[in-house]
C-alpha cells in the first residue's frame, strides 16, 4: 500500500509538472465526411482547469471542432524534458468544447493572457476573422507517467484515479 501511495503522489507530481511546462495542446478528430483523421497543435493557456486555444478554421481539426465532431485532446511531455524518450509523460482526454465569441467580455481577457504567455504574435492574429477562441473543459482521460504507470483522470482538475490502470 505504501508503494502504491508513493507511486500515486509521484504520478500527480508528474501531471502537475507536465501541465506547467507544456505550451501546446494536440488536437485529433475524425472527419464526419470521410474516414480521415484531422490533427493539429495549438498553443494553450490553462485557467482554473480550463484550457483555452486560439486557432484558425483553415485547419481541418478546427473545422471539426466547429462542426461538433468528437475531439481527443492531448498534452505530451517535451522531448527536451523527458528522462526517457520511450516513456514520455502524456495526457489524453475528451472535453466539452465551447467557442468564446468576439463580442463576449471573456474574449479580450483570455486573448490578453494568451499574448502574455505566448508572445506578441497573438496581438496580430487576434484580428484575423478565421481564428476562433475555444474553452476546453476536460471530462475524462488517461495519463501515462512512465513504463507501466497509467491512471484514469477526470474533471477540470484532471484528478487521477486512486488505482493505476493494469493489464489484468
Indicate residue ranges for each PLM-predicted region:
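C-terminal edge-of-domain segments
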Residues: 2-10, 113, 121-168
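Structured helix-beta-strand junction loops
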Residues: 21-22, 68, 117, 128
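Conserved hydrophobic/aromatic beta-strand scaffold that supports enzyme active sites
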Residues: 24, 39-43, 92-94, 131-135, ...
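Catalytic micro-motifs at enzyme active sites that drive phosphoryl/nucleotidyl and oxygen chemistry
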Residues: 30-31, 40-41, 61-62, 80-84, ...
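Short, structured beta-strand-loop surface elements
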Residues: 58-117, 140
Amino acid at each position: 500500500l505504501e508503494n502504491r501511495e508513493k507511486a500515486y503522489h509521484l504520478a500527480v507530481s508528474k501531471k502537475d509538472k507536465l501541465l506547467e511546462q507544456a505550451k501546446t495542446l494536440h488536437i485529433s478528430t475524425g472527419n464526419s465526411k470521410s474516414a480521415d483523421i484531422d490533427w493539429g497543435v495549438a498553443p494553450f493557456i490553462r485557467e482554473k482547469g480550463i484550457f483555452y486555444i486560439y486557432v484558425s478554421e483553415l485547419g481541418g481539426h478546427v473545422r471539426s471542432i466547429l462542426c461538433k465532431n468528437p475531439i481527443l485532446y492531448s498534452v505530451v511531455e517535451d522531448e527536451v524534458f523527458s528522462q526517457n524518450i520511450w516513456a514520455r509523460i502524456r495526457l489524453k482526454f475528451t472535453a466539452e468544447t465551447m467557442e468564446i465569441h468576439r463580442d463576449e467580455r471573456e474574449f479580450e481577457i483570455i486573448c490578453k493572457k494568451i499574448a502574455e504567455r505566448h508572445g506578441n504574435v497573438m496581438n496580430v492574429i487576434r484580428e484575423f476573422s478565421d481564428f476562433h477562441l475555444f474553452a476546453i473543459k476536460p471530462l475524462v482521460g488517461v495519463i501515462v507517467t512512465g513504463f507501466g504507470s497509467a491512471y484514469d483522470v477526470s474533471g477540470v482538475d484532471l484528478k487521477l484515479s486512486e488505482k493505476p490502470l493494469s493489464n489484468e
